[in-house]
Each structure stands twice: as C-alpha cells, then as structure tokens.
Amino acid sequence: MFRLNSLSALAELAVGSRWYHGGSQPIQIRRRLMMVAFLGASAVTASTGLLWKRAHAESPPCVDNLKSDIGDKGKNKDEGDVCNHEKKTADLAPHPEEKKKKRSGFRDRKVMEYENRIRAYSTPDKIFRYFATLKVISEPGEAEVFMTPEDFVRSITPNEKQPEHLGLDQYIIKRFDGKKISQEREKFADEGSIFYTLGECGLISFSDYIFLTTVLSTPQRNFEIAFKMFDLNGDGEVDMEEFEQVQSIIRSQTSMGMRHRDRPTTGNTLKSGLCSALTTYFFGADLKGKLTIKNFLEFQRKLQHDVLKLEFERHDPVDGRITERQFGGMLLAYSGVQSKKLTAMQRQLKKHFKEGKGLTFQEVENFFTFLKNINDVDTALSFYHMAGASLDKVTMQQVARTVAKVELSDHVCDVVFALFDCDGNGELSNKEFVSIMKQRLMRGLEKPKDMGFTRLMQAMWKCAQETAWDFALPKQ
C-alpha cells in the first residue's frame, strides 16, 4: 500500500514538473509574439498619416470640387491681394517692357500643392490623364489623348499650375483633319525641335510620354552599358528588336516604369515598340537600319535641350533674358528644400540682385551642361576640399572648364553663390550644392512614386518570415 502511494505521488510529481517546465516555454514564445505584434501595430499606426496624404493624391477625380470649395474661402483674400497688387504697380509705374508680377493666392497655392502630390505619388496613367490637354477624335470615331510639349514640361515641373477648366479626364476636343493638322504642325513644336519627330503636330501619346520620361531620367552611362550588352557582334549598332529590349530593361529600372500598369479602361496601355515616327527617325523608313549609341545620345541631348528651352520660355523672357530669381527658381524646382529655407534662399537672391541684368539662354544652357557632369564635378570639388583649397567662384569656373568643357560666366557664378553661400564668406557649401543639383539634373524623375509604405510592409513581412523560427524554437 505504501509502495503504491509512493509510486502515484512520484507520478504526479513528474507530471507537475513536466507541466511547469513545458509551460514556461510557450509563455515566453507568446510574450515574444505579442511583442512582434505590438511593434507591427505601431508601424501600421505610424504609417496611417502617410496613407492619408497618399489618399489626397489618389482619391479626387478632378480638382473642380477642390477649386470651387477653396475659391469660396479664398475669394476675399484673393481680391484683397489683387487690389493691393494693382495699387503697388500703379505707384511704382514700371517700365512698359517689364512683366507684372503674378501673385498666387490661397486657392492657387492649394491647387498647386494638390498637383505636386499627383506628380510625386500618382501612377503614370493618372499623371498623363491629368496634365494632357488634347483629345483627338479620328475619322472612324476613335479618340486618343495627347500631350503638347508644354503639357509634358508642366507634368514634370513642380508648382506649374494646370490651366483652368482642364484637369483629370478634361480635355480640349479636336476632330482629326489631315489638312488642318498638317497646317497646325508648327503650333505645338518647331521644325527643329525633337518633338517634331513624334508625329502629328509634335503631340505626345502615352507611350511617347513613358519613353521620354525614361530617356530624361536615365543617365547617359546606363544607356552606354545597355547598348554594349545587346551589341552582340561588337559593331556599336543595334537593330529595332534589340533596341526594344534595351528600352524595356531601362524602363523597368525607372520609377515611372516600375509604377506603370496597363489600364485598358482609360486607353493608356504601353504599346510594344515605339511610335511609327520615332522608329522611322531611328531606323529609317524600311525599319531595317541600325541605331548607334552616338546617335541615340544625340537624341537624348536634343531632348534635354528642348525641354530646357521650354522651361526657359515659360518664364516669359524680356529681350531674351530671365531674371536671377527665375533662374534660381529653376535650380531649386526639384530640390525638396523645406519651404521656409526655400523662401530664405529666394529672399537672399532678391537682396543681391535688386536690379540684375538677367541671364540669357546660352548662359543657362552652359550651366546645365556643367550639371550633366555633376558626379565628376562632385569628385573634383572633393579633391579641392581635401587639398584645403577654398571653393570660390574661380574654382568653380576652373572645374567647369576641366570637367564639362564649358565657360561659366561671372554672373552665373554670382547667382549660384548667392543661393548656396550660406555664411556669406564667398565659399560654396559644396555638399548641399551637389545634392540639390543631382536632383535638378534628374528632374525628380528618379524618386520612387510612393510614400514608402509598401516597401515598409514588404520589409516587415520579410523580417517576420526570417525570424519566425527564431521565436518559435526554444532557446538552447
């Protein structure tokens, strides 16, 4: 009897021991899983604000409602601004050739903020549908949406407001008339412009829009490497099929290409190959020609020149010159600098050039040619910095001559230093200058077209998958 009681007591003791030691591990596992769940919930909560901003860029079908609501609120303020502005201009009595300064009211600022969010976070399909202004109806009755070259520049330039009564899926309707279209060809693009090669009137289709943004957002070196990879016989030329492969690979690496999804409902599908006008331009009428990297890079250079020319003309130059503040605005357009600092930099520029002589297009183009070599410029400026030399205006002009083979005028250097000489000692803040100029060179097209929420969730999911077994297995 005593033996049976002892055995039962030992058995119960063993069961209790197993329950105690076995139950402590699940408790620890549950604590770890609860900690992971808490961190995940915190990350989702922190991302809610980002999603809210994203929703503003995606949800409104057009800006008509926004314009009407904001117009009522800002009507009185706008009228006051206009009245005050008219009084000031009447008192100052400016020169007849001078343009009146156009002040943006509360309503315009809110609309431009909304349009900037569209440029930054929307899909290529929505960007194209919002900033395109023409819908051409063909003789069979089929309709296709087109951009003008000015629309294209506006779609990639921050703070450029879309014309009134034109917005998402709101267009000027034109019926196709071959004779009239041919007569109006020079209305949208000059004969020497690269846009003239795009077909009727120099208009830009959705496929052309994706192709042009790809060309603008891809460095020259990337195209050189891609051409060499598909040049199997080493003659430096590619045929049409090989070029389509080059284009597809390059496009898949850009932010526009990664965000694009074909949308048959809107008609914005990425057609295989290029438009007929571009294929003829690159490969001849029979499409059996060869395209060299030299000819393609010349096409890229002309495109950059024409886009820069359109940007210059948008500032309404007087006697072929734009003001120093307008040039500074071109440099800072894609900087991403906070509004307060941006305002301070513009005020500093206005202080230095109250009665400036302005800048010609040749001076502006020389500086942007200098920017095309910004990586080499960064290296050269770093060498000067390590050698203890000051980065003054003479140094910048020397770097431009050595690296980019262009001459920067003294006046251009004065404007650049007025913007980036923070402490006023006559020396350039090269780190900030180089970082902002790299963004300006790519026109903001290299930035991801999202708020980063998707990438955050993908990283969290990958981390959870890799660490799940570590939480589940007991510690040794």
UniProtKB/Swiss-Prot annotation:
Report domain EF-hand positions.
Answer: 218-253, 408-443
Activity control, per UniProt: Activated by spermine, kaempferol and SB202190, which bind MICU1 and prevent MCU pore occlusion in absence of calcium.
Q: What is the effect of changing residue 121 to A?
A: Decreased ability to inhibit MCU channel activity in absence of calcium
GO molecular function per UniProt: calcium channel inhibitor activity; calcium channel regulator activity; calcium ion binding; calcium ion sensor activity; identical protein binding; protein heterodimerization activity
How is this chain modified after translation?
Phosphorylation at Ser-122 by AKT1 impairs its maturation and stability. Asymmetric dimethylation at Arg-455 by PRMT1 decreases the calcium sensitivity of MICU1 by promoting interaction with UCP2.
**Gene Ontology BP annotations:** calcium import into the mitochondrion; calcium ion import; cellular response to calcium ion; cellular response to calcium ion starvation; defense response; mitochondrial calcium ion homeostasis; mitochondrial calcium ion transmembrane transport; positive regulation of cristae formation
The record's InterPro entries line, in alphabetical order, gives: EF-hand-dom_pair, EF_Hand_1_Ca_BS, EF_hand_dom, MICU1/2/3
Subcellular locations according to the entry: Mitochondrion intermembrane space; Mitochondrion inner membrane
Q: What is the effect of changing residue 154 to K?
A: Does not affect interaction with MCU
Residue span of region K/R-ring: 126-129, 259-263
> Which residues make up the transit peptide?
1-33
Q: Where is this region: C-helix region?
A: 455-465
- What keywords does the record list, in alphabetical order? Allergen, Calcium, Calcium transport, Disease variant, Disulfide bond, Ion transport, Membrane, Metal-binding, Methylation, Mitochondrion, Mitochondrion inner membrane, Phosphoprotein, Repeat, Transit peptide, Transport
Q: What is the effect of changing residue 463 to A?
A: Abolishes interchain disulfide bond and heterodimer formation with MICU2
Asymmetric dimethylarginine, modified sites: 455
Task: Kindly list the positions annotated as binding Ca(2+) 1.
Answer: 231, 233, 235, 237, 242
Disease connection: Myopathy with extrapyramidal signs: An autosomal recessive disorder characterized by early-onset proximal muscle weakness with a static course and moderately to grossly elevated serum creatine kinase levels accompanied by learning difficulties. Most patients develop subtle extrapyramidal motor signs that progress to a debilitating disorder of involuntary movement with variable features, including chorea, tremor, dystonic posturing and orofacial dyskinesia. Additional variable features include ataxia, microcephaly, ophthalmoplegia, ptosis, optic atrophy and axonal peripheral neuropathy. An homozygous partial MICU1 deletion is responsible for a disorder manifesting in childhood with fatigue, lethargy and muscle weakness. The disease is caused by variants affecting the gene represented in this entry.
Comment block on domains:
The EF-hand domains have high affinity for calcium and act as sensors of calcium levels.
Could you describe the subunit structure of this protein? Answer: Heterodimer; disulfide-linked; heterodimerizes with MICU2 or MICU3. Homodimer; disulfide-linked. Component of the uniplex complex, composed of MCU, EMRE/SMDT1, MICU1 and MICU2 (or MICU3) in a 4:4:1:1 stoichiometry. The composition of calcium sensors within the uniplex complex can differ depending on tissues: a MICU1 homodimer can be present instead of the MICU1-MICU2 heterodimer in skeletal-muscle and kidney. MICU1 is recruited to the uniplex complex by EMRE/SMDT1, and it associates with MCU at low calcium levels, occluding the pore of the MCU channel. Associates with the MICOS complex.
Family recorded in the similarity comment: Belongs to the MICU1 family. MICU1 subfamily.
Return the protein name: Calcium uptake protein 1, mitochondrial
Query: What organism does the record attribute this protein to?
Result: Homo sapiens
